[in-house]
Structures are given as structure tokens and as C-alpha cells.
Design a protein with these regions (language model features):
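Conserved N-terminal catalytic core of the sugar/cofactor nucleotidyltransferase
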Residues: 33-98
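Residues at the C-termini of beta-strands that transition into short coil/loop
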Residues: 25, 70-71, 135
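N-terminal glycine-rich phosphate-binding loop and ensuing alpha1 helix
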Residues: 2-49
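Short clusters of hydrophobic/aromatic residues that line enzyme substrate/ligand-binding pockets
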Residues: 16, 21, 67, 74, ...
Length: 147
């Protein structure tokens, strides 16, 4: 079974410019997602989908592949996660490389770990599911989580 991790890292954040490569505990925030994916040893390839040369350089320095820069249509404020994922999968399909499983990881997820990725893969296999998505219960109105 061929598996790919696709880490989404658009360069055009409006609220926090360059958020995907901002330092978080002395590391670029994207590095946590890349290292978790690589160290999980689940994936044949760890890809970063970005439209930004700076993000590309950082991603490659942590061992991810960036085979192309994302198109402008899939990098604008209205582009969806699904559109960006399909762009990567279609790129590989055009190279006659098909993946059986694709995992979407966001670049600004510094608390992701290889063990969480492995656990989610085990849930996927064990339950004969076609997707796994992390959620968390919050006991109060979510607005109370904000300052």
C-alpha cells in the first residue's frame, strides 16, 4: 500500500504573515508536522504543498519533498483543502504514481506527533474506515476558550 502525507502550507496568511515558518519553541512551526510524518515511518513520501519559495526551502531542509509550487488558483483565500490535496494527487497521477492512502496534515500543527499519526492509521485499519479526523470535546461554550 502506497501512502503519502500531504502537508498544506500556503504562504498567503493575512492574519499572521509567514505563519507556517514562524518560530515556535525555536523551530519553524512547519517542522513539527514534517518531523512527525517522517518519524512515523508510515509514509512513502512526505510532501509539502505550498505556493511560497521560503516555505519550500524550510520544508526541504527538514526532509519533505516539494515537487512543485502550488498554483495560484489553489493558493488564494477561497481555495479549499480538498482542491489543494487533489492538485498534489493529480500531479503524481500525471507521473503514473498513485497512492492508496493520503493523509492531510496542516503545517501549523506543532502538537502533532508520530504516535498520533500511527494511532490514527491503526484506527483507520482496524475499523475498516475510509477517514479519520481528530476532534476534541470542550465542556463550555467555545467562545470561553478565547481571550
Amino acid at each position: 500500500m502506497k501512502k503519502v502525507a500531504i502537508i498544506l502550507a500556503r504562504g498567503g496568511s493575512k492574519r499572521i504573515p509567514n505563519k507556517n515558518i514562524k518560530s515556535f519553541l525555536d523551530q519553524p512551526i512547519i517542522s513539527y508536522s514534517i518531523r512527525a510524518a517522517i518519524s512515523s515511518q508510515l509514509f512513502d513520501e512526505v510532501i509539502v504543498s505550498t505556493d511560497c519559495e521560503k516555505i519550500k526551502k524550510v520544508a526541504e531542509s527538514y526532509g519533505a519533498k516539494v515537487p512543485f509550487l502550488r498554483s495560484s488558483i489553489n493558493s488564494n483565500d477561497h481555495a479549499t483543502t480538498v482542491d489543494a490535496l487533489f492538485e498534489v494527487l493529480n500531479f503524481y497521477k500525471s507521473k503514473n504514481k498513485i497512492f492508496d492512502l493520503a493523509t492531510c496534515i496542516y503545517a501549523c500543527a506543532p502538537f502533532i506527533t508520530s504516535s498520533l499519526l500511527i494511532k490514527s492509521y491503526e484506527i483507520l485499519k482496524t475499523n475498516n474506515s475510509d477517514s479519520v479526523f481528530p476532534v476534541m470535546a470542550y465542556s463550555h461554550p467555545i467562545q470561553r476558550a478565547l481571550k
